[in-house]
Amino acid sequence: MKLSDYVVDFLHEKGIKDAFLLAGGGIMHLLDSIAKSDINKYYNLHEQASAFAADGYGQFANKPALVLATTGPGATNTITGVASAYIDSIPMIVITGQVKRADITKINGVRQTGGQEIDIVSMAKGITKYAKT
């Protein structure tokens, strides 16, 4: 079993029935695992649409939906929808991709070397109950 299979199974067992997402390389293993699951998948053309769809879903169903977005700009595109849900106390789970720790460039002082690095956790901490890498 892959870790991504475990994550998807865990979320499904905890009651996640629906996921809003846009495919991207930073979440490819989760995409493969969710494709095999019983979780309903709603593919959007923009990550912000996924976050707002999950916000609307949470308002209607009173339970969290899952949002999946890839690294860098994919993750930052969810921020407005996440903030909207946070302000209205709407449940939502957002999982974004991240570059490998070995590829993170903060260690060598370079801003970016092509991995679409963004410190999404720092951006999300003020508008979420929990944000972690």
What are these regions (language model features)?
Residues M1-T133:
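N-terminal alpha/beta PP-like core and its mobile active-site loop of ThDP/TPP-dependent enzymes
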